[in-house]
């Protein structure tokens, strides 16, 4: 079970320690790397991210990670901003407020500011997630289980959506596009349900 090569991609824009500990608690060894050989020989990959999409894509470019991530053929899980980076574009502009940020384009989604009505931004704290029946990422996780969110931008619900959440309006809580998976919430901060989701991903 634990002989897999598990790699957290070293994006330079995330505190990876909590993700690393969450994986290690399940009995897996984890490597943090941006080395192409290590990344492409991994059995499972994690793409965490914090900050803005523009900063994160700049970091990926500086580290020669954009094409590398696109070459991955094994399951990859983007977490929070890491999920958003899988989309085509993001409205989260960072320094330049007049243009969309081009993302990795691995999933046919565009990241937009949450339309929350009267609810405050960021969307921060525990909220329920409703997953599509039968997706292995949510195996044995109860419908309406709570996960922990911290974000102001999200993908709208679309064909790529495998789970959704509602905060004023529905948004995508998890995506899948081929071998690329993403979760908007933080599974490493989401108690037993989050640990189960990480375990499900590692067992894909």
From Swiss-Prot:
Sorted UniProt keywords: Amino-acid biosynthesis, Cytoplasm, Glutamine amidotransferase, Histidine biosynthesis, Hydrolase, Lyase
Gene3D superfamilies to which the protein is assigned, alphabetical: 3.40.50.880
Main location: cytoplasm
Gene Ontology BP annotations: L-histidine biosynthetic process
Subcellular location: Cytoplasm
Limits of the Glutamine amidotransferase type-1 domain: 5-204
Recorded metabolic or biological pathway in which this protein acts: Amino-acid biosynthesis; L-histidine biosynthesis; L-histidine from 5-phospho-alpha-D-ribose 1-diphosphate: step 5/9
Active site, per annotation: 80 (nucleophile), 186, 188
Leader sequence residues: none
Catalytic activity: 5-[(5-phospho-1-deoxy-D-ribulos-1-ylimino)methylamino]-1-(5-phospho-beta-D-ribosyl)imidazole-4-carboxamide + L-glutamine = D-erythro-1-(imidazol-4-yl)glycerol 3-phosphate + 5-amino-1-(5-phospho-beta-D-ribosyl)imidazole-4-carboxamide + L-glutamate + H(+); L-glutamine + H2O = L-glutamate + NH4(+)
One function term, GO molecular function aspect: glutaminase activity
Quaternary structure and interacting proteins, as annotated: Heterodimer of HisH and HisF.
Xref: HAMAP family: HisH (MF_00278)
Descriptive protein name: Imidazole glycerol phosphate synthase subunit HisH
Classification lineage: Bacteria, Pseudomonadati, Pseudomonadota, Gammaproteobacteria, Vibrionales
